[in-house]
C-alpha cells in the first residue's frame, strides 16, 4: 500500500495551535476518491486537502470527515502556505489550483496569502 503523508497547517494565525487547522496531503500520484474520504475520516481536523502537481498547476480537492466539499478557504490558504514553506513553489510565484469549482490562484503578499477565484 502507498503511504500518504500529511501536514497540519493552521490558517488565519501566526501562533501555534490557534487559527483554523487543515490537513494537507501532498500526493505524488492520483489516489481513489474513496481513499481520500477514508483519510479525511481518520485525521481529526475540519478539512483535509489533497494536492497533486500536474504540469504547471496543482490539482486540488477538499474532504471533510463526511463528504467532498466544492471549496474551502482555509484549506486553500493552508495548502498554498505549505507549498511555499516547503520550497515546492518559490514565494515570489503565484500558484494555480485546478479544482472541481474552477481555478483558484494564490499569491503571497505582505506575509499573507491572497486567494483569487478565476
Say what each PLM segment does.
Residues 24-28, 51-52:
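Short beta-strand-to-turn element immediately C-terminal to the catalytic PLP-Schiff-base lysine
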Residues 35-69:
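Anion-binding (especially nucleotide phosphate/pyrophosphate-binding) glycine-rich loop
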Residues 63-118:
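Acidic, low-complexity central loop/insert segments
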